[in-house]
Structures are given as C-alpha cells and as structure tokens.
C-alpha cells in the first residue's frame, strides 16, 4: 500500500519544457484556490551562432516569479527576462526557476531547462583545375643544367591564388615514371615526379589520377605514381590508382574546418587496357558512358552509385571527379548528362569533370532529393603544349560550402577562367588567371608569336568562355 500511495502523489506531465512532476494535491479543490496549467518554455533546445540573441518565452506563467540562470556564462548569458546571448562555441543549459502560487500560503517551484548549443558557421573553400598534360616540350621546360627537373614556373601565376583555398584539386593526367629514359609525351606519357613536388609547393592537396593515360607506363607507372603520393600523404590525397586490390573500394575523406568531404574519382576509359589488373585504375565498366567503345572497366555503374551513397552517409559533402566526354568539344554529351543526373541522385554534392582538353559549361542539376548540384562538365587543360586557342582557355571550379547545425550547404559556386601561356618559342609554360593576363602577354603566346594565328586575345578568350553556357549559382 505504501508503494501505491507514493505513486499516486506524483503525476508525470509532458510539456514543451520536458516532463515535470506535478503534486497531485494541487488538483484538490479543497487545498488549491488557483487552478492553472503547468509552466513551460517555448523551446527546450536551441542552436545559435556566436553573437546571436534569442528570447525564451515562458508559457502558463502569469503571476509567477521567475529567475534565470546560465550553466556557463562563457558560452551564453541570460537576462532577467530570458534574453539569451550566445557568446562562444560550446554547450550549456539555461534554467528558468518558476515559482507558482498553489494556495494563498503555498507555492511550488519548477525548473525548466533549455539546452543551448553555440556553434560558429564552419566554412571551406574548394577549387579544382584541369589536366596537367605533360607533352615532350612541357617535360623539357623543367630540365635544369644539372639534369634535375623543376616545374615551379608553371604555377608562378596561380600558386598564391591556389593557397587561398582549403582544398585544391588537380588532375594529374599523365603517370609518373622514375626512369628518365622513359620521360615522354604523346602518345604514351611518362612524367617526372618533379611535377608532384611543384604541385605540392603550389598548394595542391587533392590529386586525381584515373585518366585515359593511367596505363601509359604500365605497372611501373602505377607503382611510381602511387608510391610518390603515398610518400606525401600528409600533404596530398591521391585518388584513382591502386597497387593492391584491397584499396580499390577505398573512399578518401578530408576534414576541413570541421567539414568532412569525400572524394571519388574515375575514368570512363583507357587508351589501352591490355594486361591491366582490374583494380589498378578506377574505370567505369558500363559502355553507356564510354564514347570511345568497349574498353576494360571494373567499376560497375551500380558499384559507383553505391560508393557515392556510402560516401554520403559518412561525409558532409561529396565531390565526384569523372574523366569523361569527347575531346575538343565544348558541349557535354547526352551520356554525360545522364550519368551526372544519376550521380547527383545518388548523393553527389558537386561534380567536377576533366578530359576534353577544352572547357565545358558549369550547369546546375536538380537532384531527386531537392539538392542543387553544380556540375562542371570539363575544366579543360591546365598545362599542355597544345597551341590552339580553345585548348589554352581553361577554368577553375570554385566552391564555398558551409556547415551549421548539422546541415552542409553550398554558399557559392563559380567558374573562373584561366589561360595556359606557352612562350613564343615553346620553352616555358605558365598559367595565369585570365583577369591577370594582358594583350601584351598574349602577343608573345606561341599561338600568335610562333604560328601567327592571332587568335589569342584577352577579349577573345573571355568571349569564348562566356559563350559556352555557364549557369549562375543563386
């Protein structure tokens, strides 16, 4: 009987402020002269940015006395009227002690709690550049008198700009090789590892290697490329190539300013796949997206989408980096568009493509879950020995993403034109922002100076860039 009596004295009441215990005797008309609802707070959980204010409202508290207290005034302060001011990142609880008159001579107190999280908006700036395509003359441009190689000059016009980004992605079009006798350009490229040194020095920290040239130097090219980037894993993440089967399904993540970003890179084809192990390169198996025919591929469409979904479940933001499309055309194929839509629907938050050696437009895709996904179909080259005007007009994909209160969104997506400057004699190469380029510099571009084409001017390049049909992020 004692247990039953104690249970009867307290009745749980659910309110917005949580469950409180109300004295059952207060409902007794012989004892209570005041019939009222239980006090409650309008909010029991809040997330605020530092500096923001919010006023908690007491409900059912007319005629009651109230005192307010913050559990940690270094995180939030609270005024006598329940006005919260967020001070600094952290978690604490604001308590309102409400004293309610029950009878003329009796009161009851309630402690109403609101959990408060103060969180600064996290932000990450991401950029990507196109193909580092090392033709014979590009290789030769870095050779020094002592036989070593240095390619810092290529990045002289962009390195400072690159370092303003938290994530800087580049497409290493051609595999590394460690035998100088095999340093070569088209058609079976072999590139000095000195390029990697220059990339790191320029601020590049994510490198894609799944391209149509990945198998140009066969197994040794795979080994040297993977080993080089593995030895620099604290400075850059390499995507796309694998020495062993157990890393083939690996998804790479990078945490930047509290935002976890996933990266997935693949190519739709190889120039030649004879003798390759199925796990060496991320190659999409489906010929639906392979405009060049039935080349070897081990990454099925279903596995690709599963990989994107898995990345989405573990990351705040997913970037997919396909090597796809038709060379030397500014227009995405229907196959690219279909694949882009499917990748967006699977969870890709941004799609950044390479391979065509010319820029294709940035378009905004509406994903099936309502997200808006920027798709840069092609960034064009970054450095090459192609003298044609369109192949020297290039782009930087630029994204600013933010995370707050568990939600990651794209604040801005831009496409910035750049230009590959080939010296008149084609002995040196440097890439510039088009906004930093002048017609005086253009006059010394090999396309104009050596070949007399006169096709590269600042206005001409800008007009071409604006003509490809880029959409604007709003």
Residue ranges, per PLM feature:
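Sec-dependent N-terminal signal peptides of Gram-positive bacterial secreted proteins and lipoproteins
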Residues: 1-17
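Extracytoplasmic soluble-region selector
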Residues: 4, 18-120
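Ser/Thr-centric signal marking residues that sit
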Residues: 7, 92, 225
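Acidic, metal/ion-coordinating pockets
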Residues: 95, 117-474
């Amino acid at each position: 009987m004692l247990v039953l009596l104690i249970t009867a004295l307290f009745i749980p009441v659910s309110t917005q402020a949580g469950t409180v215990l109300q004295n059952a005797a207060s409902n007794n008309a012989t004892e209570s002269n005041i019939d009222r609802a239980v006090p409650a707070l309008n909010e029991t959980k809040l997330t605020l940015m530092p500096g923001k204010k919010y006023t908690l409202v007491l409900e059912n508290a007319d005629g009651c006395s109230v005192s307010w207290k913050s559990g940690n005034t270094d995180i939030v302060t609270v005024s006598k009227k329940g006005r919260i001011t967020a001070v600094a990142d952290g978690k604490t609880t604001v308590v309102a002690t409400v004293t309610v008159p029950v009878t003329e001579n009796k009161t009851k107190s309630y402690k109403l709690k609101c959990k408060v999280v103060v969180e600064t908006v996290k932000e990450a700036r991401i950029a990507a550049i196109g193909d580092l395509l090392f033709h014979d003359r590009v290789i030769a441009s870095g050779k020094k008198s002592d036989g070593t190689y240095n390619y810092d000059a290529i990045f002289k016009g962009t390195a400072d700009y690159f370092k303003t980004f938290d994530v800087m992605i580049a497409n290493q079009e051609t595999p590394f090789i460690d035998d100088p006798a095999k340093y070569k350009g088209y058609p079976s490229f072999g590139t000095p590892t000195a390029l990697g040194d220059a990339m790191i020095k320029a601020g590049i920290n994510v490198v894609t290697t799944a391209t149509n040239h990945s198998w140009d130097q066969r197994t040794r090219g795979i080994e040297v490329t993977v080993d080089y980037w593995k030895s620099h894993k604290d400075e850059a993440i390499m995507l796309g190539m694998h020495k062993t089967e157990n890393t083939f399904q690996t998804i790479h993540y990078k945490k930047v300013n509290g935002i976890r970003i996933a990266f997935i890179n693949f190519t739709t084809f190889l120039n030649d796949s004879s003798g390759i192990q199925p796990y060496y390169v991320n190659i999409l198996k489906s010929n639906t997206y392979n405009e060049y025919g039935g080349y070897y591929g081990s990454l099925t469409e279903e596995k690709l989408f599963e990989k994107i979904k898995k990345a989405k479940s573990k990351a705040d933001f997913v970037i997919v980096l396909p090597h796809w499309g038709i060379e030397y055309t500014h227009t995405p194929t229907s196959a690219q568009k279909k694949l882009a839509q499917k990748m967006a629907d699977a969870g890709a938050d941004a799609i950044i493509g390479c391979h065509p050696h010319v820029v294709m437009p940035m378009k905004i895709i509406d994903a099936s879950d309502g997200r808006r996904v920027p798709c840069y179909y092609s960034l064009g080259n970054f450095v090459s020995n192609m003298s044609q005007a369109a192949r020297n007009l290039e782009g930087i994909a630029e994204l600013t993403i933010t995370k707050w209160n568990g939600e990651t969104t794209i604040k801005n997506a831009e496409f910035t034109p750049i230009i590959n400057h080939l010296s008149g004699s084609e002995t040196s190469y440097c890439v510039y922002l088009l906004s930093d380029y002048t017609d005086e510099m253009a006059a010394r571009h090999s396309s104009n100076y050596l070949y007399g084409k006169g096709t590269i001017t600042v206005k001409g390049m800008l007009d071409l860039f604006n003509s490809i049909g880029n959409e604007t992020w709003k």
